């Protein structure tokens, strides 16, 4: 039987009909990769380099810079940001959401609070480009807090834990990812040598083995004002690391990138300049040259197929573009979809014990976390012009004085930190028009307010690390199903007291920067006591947890190499592995962890298939 040839076999499990369905079984491959975003593309490249035959299954359509990023259609705000062209189709599958276990969850039917991607490149095609590493403290968060503040400092019901891997172990993979992405930035120290003082480096950054591939992007006027104000109140501003190129670049795989022109259309759009790193631009061109690699679009994976004892995966079952069930046998299964899709597939497939919040037992679905973000906007008079239509998704200036544990949390009684930044990514004419509080939503007064504020404002964020709690988790919904007849994933989530107290503290500190700019008005603020998670307002798409990594199979779904404790030929890279949220954006950490996992597969697992860590 040749590659791609089909035979009909009976397959049990969820289906669109009742009972047993008939599926087409393809020839076995060495590895099947589920989801082709950053994690999937990295894994596919690494495993293909190792000599494996790799098939990547992407549920969405084929996407690329052309035609999806072709100018001028690619800067159509109505199509992309308002009508959400590149995002997940919620009419086929979504999640249900409730604030606590006493409520009945209802489906998330309109894209708003978070925006999962679909299609080639996943969210990596239309992300902003903010490309951080991680603060080392956040990798051993529980043990660090217990050592510095005592075990009783961590609130009851907070389930934070250590990642099980250190910054020094991951540093080569952060470096590798930056060279693939073409990241622009300013280093602080390289191999212990100071190079970034008064040159845009981050005073709080951990040591690096080499410099950024490209210098930091130029600072917008907003970023300059923020940096001056931050310095004036004693903080340490630095250039944000950006996967938007500051100059021409050829990456590790031979992919060529052009310099960013600050067009302001990054988040929600495909970059027409080949300036923003994406799986489509930075990895796929090299994979296309590999005869051992195949990407199949419109391939919706229904489940991972397991042996009768559920100790080994035999491949996956998916629906192709014609709606036919297809079985793709494989020796190795990589779940590299979006965070909650990884968790959903594990629950549907019976990989790992589902989390039970009542007993606090089980692992799949536990420690779901988000991003605790707060925003302030400074409005100036007409003598200060900020040109907010200019922008690059990852460019900006940040301060880390209150990130991670860079300050003494003891007097304040909350866990977690937050960077502050001005990240001018391009304020759009439909969705990005700030007006003072009390302005009507339409009419002559609204028009006058827009004219008065649009070109004279700055927006800044406190990008708070969100902690994990026993009360916030993922499981299968008992009431709602997707179009394929499978239970939807249920998200039980709400802000906790720690989140609100942290947000209020951070906004107070960030407000000092804002006031130092001498604006005529400041709008925005922190969550107040009793604030509930609002699904109707965009916050971030930085979801994490649910299939977390760790050193104990009783409290983690995957080991330190992202290998399933229960099914050792299944690996699950992605933000689903984070035991709690980070202060920084997750993409850099996802990329480094995926390279780390891929190396373990190549150098250890393929030589001796089986558990890489003994339970």
From Swiss-Prot:
The catalysed reaction is: D-gluconate + A = 2-dehydro-D-gluconate + AH2
What this protein needs as a cofactor is: FAD
Major location (coarse) = membrane
Quaternary state and interactors: Heterotrimer.
Activity as a function of temperature is given as:
Optimum temperature is 30 degrees Celsius.
Q: Which top EC class is named for this enzyme in its record?
A: oxidoreductase
The pH response of activity is noted as: Optimum pH is 5.0.
Instruction: Report the leader peptide range.
Output: 1-22
**What name does the UniProt record give this protein?**
Gluconate 2-dehydrogenase flavoprotein
Q: Which InterPro entries does the entry mention?
A: FAD/NAD-bd_sf (IPR036188), GMC_OxRdtase_N (IPR000172), GMC_OxRtase_C (IPR007867)
Cell location? Cell membrane
User: Keyword annotations for this protein?
Assistant: Cell membrane, FAD, Flavoprotein, Membrane, Oxidoreductase, Signal
Q: Which organism is it from?
A: Pantoea cypripedii
